[in-house]
Every structure is written in structure tokens, then in C-alpha cells.
Amino acid sequence: NFNSIYQIAEENKVLQRLDVDLIDLNIHHTPINCIQLLIAFLNDFEDRPINRSKVFKYVLKVIFDNPGSLFYGDTIDEENCGFVVGYYCELLLRKNQETFTESDFLIKTKDFCDKHHNTTNVNDLLQILKNNQIIVNFNGSLRFRFSYWIYYFAALRMKDSEDFKSFMLDAKHSLYYPEIIEFYTGIDGRAEDIVTMLITDLNALSNKVYLKLNVSGDINPYTDI
């Protein structure tokens, strides 16, 4: 098994840690997610990731740094993956689309890489993501196995593109996409713009409720108790 091969830590300790992290990080209890968390443990078992952004970063780093069977080229790393796939996830979210074709992914990402003088081999990139079940087949098309991967890569893209960030914060309204907020704030901790947006939007929603109920914001329902 995985731990026998890589000797992460004592068996029961690994199982306990795996169970705790799956619960704490709100990740689906599936075999592939267990494997991906175990991959993240390879980075440093004693270093508990504080959020899912860090877990996914560890997973991608190990996947693309692996010189074995999962590796398909020497021009791809975790940062290139985030840069390229983040752009494609932007396209998906702008079109409210979850599924896509292999040819569309390759054409769009190849054009993007050429435009930015990026040498990433997008065929290899897609194959690696498919082999690690981050992207899977679905009714003749492709999709991300779990939607949180789209939001993770989209959050990376928001860090690179002010235009896309504005789209997600304004037109798309990320207030209703908590995973976008989670990943955006978890990537590097710099999220003053998101906090400002949340405060503004929550105040606006509160004012709408007060107006419809014809009550003031300082009402205390426990006053007469």
C-alpha cells in the first residue's frame, strides 16, 4: 500500500491524521481524495496544512515534481499548471460551463501559452491531470472530478488577472461562491479586497432586510425577555 512504499509514518498515525484532515478540510471521503492527501503528506507529514488551498498546492507540487510514471515532461510544474488551468477555469466560469472537450482545452490553453510565451506542453498537462483524476471523463466530455478544483484554479487566476477578479467579485458575485472566497484568501493570506467586498455586501443585504421588515438595524429581539 501507499504508506508501505513511501514510509510516511506509523500506520495508525497516518490513518488518524487522514481522518482528521478529511473532516477538518471538508474534503469528500473518496479513495482518490485519500490518495491525494497522502501525496500531500509526502511534502511534510508533521506540517499540517491550515486550509485546503495549501493541501491542493502540496498535491499539485508532488504530482508535477514526481519523476516517475505520473510525469510527462520537463516543462511543467505546479505553478505552470495553476497559470494555464486557471485561465481555462476562467473561461468555464464566464460561460457557466462545467464540461468541456479535450480539443477545446488544448486549443484554448495552447493559444494562451503562445500569447504569454509559456512553454508548457498542454497535452502533457492534460494527461497528468487525467491520470491523477483531477479531470475525468463525463458523458463523452471532460470535467473536473470535484467542483472545488475549478474554484481553486479560478482563485489562482484571480490573483493573476484583475479583469477576472473584477468579474468574479462584481458580475459573478463571489459572495455566493464561498469556495472561491476560501481559496482566494487561503492562497497567500492577502485578501483585503475580499473582506471589503464582504462587509459592503453584507451591510447592503442587512439594509434590504431591515427595509422589508420595516425595522431598524439596532433592534434587539431579546429586550422584552
Tell what function each PLM region has.
Residues 1-161, 170-175:
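Extended hydrophobic
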Residues 160-225:
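Hydrophobic repeat-domain scaffold segments
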